[in-house]
């Protein structure tokens, strides 16, 4: 089974993916490292640009029939049996990305993406089985337990569990309104 764990940067993907793979006894694969090692991703300033079509091809060829947890911001674009979309309050995303040294522009882009469900919408366009999990206020262990419960129950789709639209006023300070 291929499980993809995606979400806005700062939602907790890597921590949760590693713990989930450990709990399931699955192989852990970083999409970023996979792309760089296969020459389908390149560093451009402080980002990595990945050819998503090539990434999907590599995943299909190398991981089909294997038990793998794919960790990465773009993992919802590759063939997977189930896609887990991790969500976190936009303010929490902002705090985490600020601590990582993200530029104001990149921080704003990611806070806005979380506010308006960008990753969730992309995942739903690409995949049949999408499970949305809110990580806000939960330990990584609690998040993994929730994911395991959803997987064991056979839940096919769980979306719409978060709505950050009411949170706009609380995170507007992180957005670059009117800035170029």
Curated annotation (Swiss-Prot):
Binding site for ATP: 10, 12-15, 100, 138
Pfam families: AAA_18
GO biological process: ribosomal small subunit biogenesis; rRNA processing
Chain intervals for the UniProt region annotation (NMP): 30-50
Keywords: ATP-binding, Kinase, Nucleotide-binding, Ribosome biogenesis, rRNA processing, Transferase
Matching InterPro entries: Adenyl_kinase_AK6, P-loop_NTPase
One Gene Ontology molecular-function label: ATP hydrolysis activity
Domain of life according to the entry: Archaea
Gene3D superfamilies listed in its UniProt record: P-loop containing nucleotide triphosphate hydrolases
Reactions catalysed: AMP + ATP = 2 ADP; ATP + H2O = ADP + phosphate + H(+)
Enzyme Commission designation: 2.7.4.3
HAMAP family, per the entry: Adenylate_kinase_AK6 (MF_00039)
Biological function: Broad-specificity nucleoside monophosphate (NMP) kinase that catalyzes the reversible transfer of the terminal phosphate group between nucleoside triphosphates and monophosphates. Also has ATPase activity. Involved in the late maturation steps of the 30S ribosomal particles, specifically 16S rRNA maturation. While NMP activity is not required for ribosome maturation, ATPase activity is. Associates transiently with small ribosomal subunit protein uS11. ATP hydrolysis breaks the interaction with uS11.
Assembly behavior: Interacts with uS11. Not a structural component of 40S pre-ribosomes, but transiently interacts with them by binding to uS11.
Protein family: Belongs to the adenylate kinase family. AK6 subfamily.
Protein name: Putative adenylate kinase
Organism per entry: Thermococcus onnurineus (strain NA1)
Organism placement in taxonomy: Archaea, Methanobacteriati, Methanobacteriota, Thermococci, Thermococcales
């Amino acid at each position: 089974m291929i499980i993809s764990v995606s979400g806005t940067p700062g939602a907790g993907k890597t921590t949760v993916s590693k713990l989930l793979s450990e709990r399931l006894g699955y192989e852990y694969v970083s999409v970023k490292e996979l792309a760089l090692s296969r020459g389908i991703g390149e560093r451009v300033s402080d980002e990595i640009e990945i050819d998503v079509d090539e990434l999907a091809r590599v995943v299909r060829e190398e991981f089909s029939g294997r038990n793998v947890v794919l960790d990465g911001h773009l993992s919802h674009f590759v063939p997977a049996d189930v896609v887990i979309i991790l969500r976190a309050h936009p303010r929490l995303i902002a705090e985490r990305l600020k601590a990582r040294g993200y530029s104001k522009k990149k921080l704003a882009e990611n806070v806005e993406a979380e506010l308006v469900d960008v990753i969730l919408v992309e995942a739903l366009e690409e995949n049949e089985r999408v499970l949305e999990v809110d990580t806000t206020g939960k330990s990584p262990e609690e998040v993994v337990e929730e994911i395991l419960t959803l997987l064991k129950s056979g839940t096919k789709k769980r979306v719409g569990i978060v709505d950050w639209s009411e949170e706009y006023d609380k995170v507007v300070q992180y957005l670059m309104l009117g800035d170029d």
